[in-house]
Every structure is written in structure tokens, then in C-alpha cells.
Amino acid sequence: MRWSRRRFLASTVFGTAVISGRSPVAFGSRTSHKLRQDELRIPITMCHGITDRLTRDRFEQYLDIARELEFTTINYDQLYLWLTGAGSLPDRPLMIDVDHPVASVASEMFPLMQRYGFTGNLFVNTGYFQDVCGGIPLEAGQSACATWDQIRELMTSGWTIGGHTHTHPNLSELSLTDPTGEQVRSEMDTNNALLEQHLGIRPEYFAFTGNSTGTTWSSVADLEAKLRYKLGRLWIIGSNCEIDGKIERYADFVNAPGPNEADGGPPFVSRYITRDTPLFRLPSMELERLLYAPEAFRQYLLGALG
């Protein structure tokens, strides 16, 4: 990934200072500087549905901020065309991702986002439906699993449905126990087959799994993902990730310059999708971590408008 000095400097000051000599307040209206398509920085958030911490009210605060700042949600088809130079995006694009098909995505988040004119993207680990989801418990305040009919309604309403393996294994650990990739291939192929069986689609986009460190990734999983999907997305909850059996600094993994930030996360420049972002190194920012405070979410969006 290549980062120009101008882009790096503009991105790394969004939290508290000014960008290009202007106060962040100036970005709240359409009269501010309009970025060219190749200058866009796309904020991308991720969550696991409504929980005791990420309540419906807190989630609606984020939607209020996004609407106030006049952001438009996009899906992965639009993103892929833009990244490959085959399409354009709205002036202020925003991505709202959800991992795991919990019921609250369909019963609470979906109708709320519809009221705001927003759509999202759901990455489905199909083992969730069979109660073999890598031992992942429901988070506090979460309901059970969404139904296939509910997920189909999301899809027909403009949501992207992506792949997220079958049983949600730690992909980094699999690099040690399954070096040939046999289990990784089975995870992806089972996931794809079930999504095709129940939804009639072959997913084109993939979200790498995560754990308490952040993204779990392996060279084998990356290779297999590239054989099956168009894009691959990571997950940021702090400054580290788990790569090929080892803990690694996220910024080093994605070749982003600069030290970690005061909030405990990677350099600000690594938190957005740009035209320079490799297709299988897309970031996503967990709403329950670095962006949890509404002001942190606001500053994240403002940082895209430099």
C-alpha cells in the first residue's frame, strides 16, 4: 500500500486538529471542498448487531451524525467498481458493516437504517445457524439468529451479503494446524454453498474472522480468499492483529506509516479505504471499540472530508 505524504498528513490529524488549515466544523456542510474521486477516503464501520453496550439508542446517534454530515451509504458492488476504476461514488460515501447474522440486525438495525435511507452489508458465518459457530457466544443483549427469510429481505433491500467462513475459526491459528489449507477451503466452500442454497447467491466479498486481538489472518486463507472473492475485509479493534500464528502490529501488516495513535488504535491513515488500499486489506472500524463515543465517530467521519 502506498501513502502519499499529503494524504498521510491530512489523515492523521482528524481527531483533534485541523485539516488543510480548516476547522473540522467547516466539513459539516456541502460548501466545503469537494474531493476528486481519486482523493476519497471512505469511512467503514463494523459491529455485531445490537448489544447491551451498542444499544439501539447509541446506534441511532451514529446514524444521526452520518445524516447530519450528509454521508451516503454504499455497498460492496459500488466499492469494487470504484476501486478498480470502473465506477464512481457519491461525494461522501460511508460503509456500515455487520458481522454474524444475529436477529437484531434484521429486527432492529435494518428498520432503523431504512428510516435514514441507509443500507448496510452483512457478512454471514453460516455455522451460526447450526449452533457450531466456533464456540462464539452471543454478546450481552443479543438475540438469537436471524432467519434466512430476514436475510433475504436485507439482500432485496440493497444490502450486500458476504461470506465469513462456516464455523468462524481463528484463521491465524489454522496456519499452524492446517498448513495445506484443507480446512480453510472447507470453511469457505461450505459457507458459499449454504449461502447459495438459501439465498441464491454466490458471495463475492469476504470478511476475515476476528478474535479478542482483532483480525485473524493467514497467508493460506488470503490465497484461498483471492480464488473465491473480489474483496477481503479486515477488522480493527485496537493496534494489533493476528497473522500466521503471531501477534503483529496492524499498521505494519498493512504497510501504513506512522506510530499508533493516542486512542490505542493504528495510524489514522490506515482506518479508511482509499484508491491505494489493496483489495484484500480493506479496514473496518469496530463501533464498540475506538469509535464508541459519538464524538469519536463524528471525528472519524470528518477525517474523511479533508
Where are these regions (language model features)?
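A structural motif
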Residues: 150-174, 184, 195-198
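Short, well-structured secondary-structure segments
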Residues: 43-47, 54, 71-77, 95, ...
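Short, glycine/acidic-enriched loop or turn micro-motifs at the edges of active sites
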Residues: 102-103, 167
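N-terminal secretory signal peptides and thylakoid transit peptides that target proteins
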Residues: 1-16
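Acidic (Asp/Glu)-rich catalytic clusters
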Residues: 111-117, 144-162, 271-277
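Alpha-helix N-cap and loop-to-helix initiation/capping positions
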Residues: 138-142, 146, 178-183
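C-terminal active-site subregion of NodB/CE4 polysaccharide deacetylases
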Residues: 24-97, 104, 172-173, 178-185, ...
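Short, solvent-exposed loop/turn and secondary-structure capping segments
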Residues: 56, 106-110, 133
